[in-house]
Amino acid sequence: MSNDFKIKLGKLLNHWIEHNREHSREFSEWAQKASQHGEKTASREMLRAAGEMERASTSLSQALASLEKGEP
């Protein structure tokens, strides 16, 4: 893998990780608001989506770690 590609991929992974975490936080905040307004099902699904975003961030973090270690 070329060094330029590795640098770009690392930057993209970092960006996606942070972007997902921001969305997860926002989903959780709005889920709480939805719950307070009686929207229990919507709130539950939003919290589920927040968890899925966190799992995606974990996978992306693992990808970044393998890239930084030079694993094929």
Model-derived regions: residue spans:
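N-terminal acidic leader/helix
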Residues: 1-30
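Short, charged, intrinsically disordered terminal tails
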Residues: 4-5, 65-72
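Residues at alpha-helix boundaries and short interhelical turns
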Residues: 17, 21, 54-57, 71
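Short, charge-rich amphipathic interface segments used for partner binding and complex assembly
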Residues: 30-66
